């Protein structure tokens, strides 16, 4: 399907203003290497 596997469990997501804040968090909490800052919350994804 090629859809991106987003992970944003509300208990694990953190607020952000910049995706750079999300990368270490995502790697630690989810193991996912990529991140975006959407609606001031980190979204973690695998590809």
Curated annotation (Swiss-Prot):
Keywords: Disulfide bond, Ion channel impairing toxin, Neurotoxin, Potassium channel impairing toxin, Secreted, Signal, Toxin, Voltage-gated potassium channel impairing toxin
Membrane spanning stretches: none
Superkingdom, natural source: Eukaryota
Tissue: Expressed by the venom gland.
PROSITE patterns: SCORP_SHORT_TOXIN
Residue numbers marked as site, Aromatic residue of the functional dyad: 45
GO MF terms, alphabetically ordered: ion channel inhibitor activity; potassium channel regulator activity; toxin activity
Keyword Electron transport recorded: no
GO CC, one annotated term: extracellular region
Database matches in SUPFAM superfamilies: Scorpion toxin-like
Stretch forming the signal peptide: 1-12
Site (Basic residue of the functional dyad): residue numbering on this chain: 36
Pfam families in the cross-refs: Toxin_2
Intrachain disulfide bonds: 16-37, 22-42, 26-44
Localization in the cell: Secreted
Major site of localization recorded for this protein: secreted
InterPro entries per UniProt: Scorpion_toxin-like_sf, Scorpion_toxinS_K_inh
Keyword Signal set for record: yes
Family classification: Belongs to the short scorpion toxin superfamily. Potassium channel inhibitor family. Alpha-KTx 07 subfamily.
Domain commentary: Has the structural arrangement of an alpha-helix connected to a beta-sheet by disulfide bonds (CSalpha/beta).
General function of this protein: Potent inhibitor of the A-type voltage-gated potassium channels. Most potent inhibitor of Kv1.2/KCNA2 channels. Reversibly block the Shaker B potassium-channels (Kv1.1 sub-family).
Identification of the protein by name: Potassium channel toxin alpha-KTx 7.1
């Amino acid at each position: 399907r090629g859809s991106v596997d987003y992970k944003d469990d509300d208990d694990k997501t953190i607020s952000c203003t910049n995706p750079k804040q999300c990368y270490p968090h995502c790697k630690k909490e989810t193991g996912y290497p990529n991140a975006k800052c959407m609606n001031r919350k980190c979204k973690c994804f695998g590809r």
